[in-house]
Regions:
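Conserved, single-site charged/polar hotspot
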Residues: 5, 9-348
Length: 348
């Protein structure tokens, strides 16, 4: 047993003994438990409360916005160069593309998934351009400037911009890989109920991760089915004269893919792809049927967009069901992995 003499209280001596895990002090037959243990407990409690107060704002931020991944400074500093707008940080460019390509009122996880796809495509373009950050000419029209965002969103500009910025920050530095290479990451608005197999569309085995995926909810979208009436050019009159018209009613769909999108169509003596026909006559989709109608051609389309990759509508529906962006991307891009852009930055 350890024994110690203390003169800590008013200069008077106390005989203290160590026992049962604490000091016991006696004076005049009355025991006094030494206060050091009590003080120590109070200090610990105060420290815990202080730690909670310091960390609480961070915890709330992570709960609302998700954790922010810190990437290498070189990746953060990557610049892209486009002709009319000069140089800008790659993440700033991605915000402009996200603003143009997906409605800002979509769910957070859908926006996050879209952000990863956009960043991946931008780095693919940088690699293909030789790594100096110069983007192809068409990239000029693929993003919105601040002026365009303000024009489109009006009073909701600040709110919408913050949402898109959060999507880029929540997925900071993340890109989609297939094996050792950046994946091709196409997306579109709305399917006919299924996405398309890239091999059927492009005739290449190059993208085995772009397969047919069910999107059952897409068929319930308001703009799933659209109808366009095409007039024969020679018959156009009045206000319709000069608008896009078809050369002849002698039109035949010659080939479709396994989910119903047109691969080949004949218009008179000319044969073109379904996507060419869609673009020429400004159709929502190359999944369409044809029907003569009072000397005109009625074209009924299903879905919106080319149909390859991620259906934004289904991605948003998945996000509404609390599915995260990683699960969304895995659903549409089979066999791919999300990796850090730092794994390729040395080659950029």
């Amino acid at each position: 047993m350890r024994v110690a003499y203390h003169t800590l209280r008013y200069g008077r001596a106390f005989l203290c003994q160590w026992g049962r895990g604490k000091w016991l002090c006696r004076r005049g037959g009355v025991q006094y438990m030494r206060r050091y243990r009590i003080i120590s407990e109070k200090v610990k409690q105060a420290g815990c409360w202080l730690l909670i107060i310091v960390l609480l704002p961070y915890i709330i931020t992570v709960f609302i916005n998700g954790p922010k991944i810190i990437t290498a400074s070189k990746a953060d500093e990557t610049m892209v160069k486009i002709e009319k707008n000069g140089k800008m940080p790659v993440e700033e460019y991605c915000i402009g593309v996200l603003a143009r390509d997906m409605p800002a009122d979509y769910e957070k996880e859908a926006l996050n998934a879209q952000a990863v796809l956009i960043r991946t495509e931008v780095y693919r373009m940088i690699q293909e351009a030789g790594g100096d950050g110069t983007l192809p000419e068409e990239a000029e029209d693929e993003f919105w400037t601040e002026k365009q965002m303000k024009s489109a969103w009006g009073m909701r500009y600040a709110e919408n911009y913050r949402k898109l910025k959060n999507a880029l920050e929540s997925t900071a530095g993340q890109v989609l890989f297939y094996g050792k290479d950046l994946a091709m990451t196409p997306f579109f608005n709305l399917s006919n109920g299924y996405t398309r197999d890239a091999k059927e569309v492009l005739g290449k085995e190059e993208y085995p991760y772009l397969k047919i995926v069910e999107c059952p909810g897409d068929v319930n979208a308001d703009n799933e089915i659209q109808t366009v009436i095409l007039e024969v050019k020679s018959e156009q009159k009045g206000e319709n004269k000069g608008t896009t018209g078809i050369e002849t009613l002698d039109v035949e769909i010659q080939e479709t893919d396994s989910v119903g999108y047109v691969l080949k169509i004949r218009v008179g003596d000319k044969v073109m792809s379904g996507e060419e026909f869609r673009n020429k006559y400004e159709l929502a989709s190359s999944c369409f049927t044809l029907q003569p109608y009072n000397g005109k051609l009625r074209v009924t389309t299903r879905g919106a967009g080319h149909g390859i990759g991620m259906s934004q509508y289904t991605a948003n529906e998945m996000a509404k069901k609390k599915q995260g962006y990683r699960k969304i991307l895995k659903y549409f891009f089979k066999g791919t992995d999300i990796k850090e852009v730092t794994e390729i930055i040395k080659n950029v």
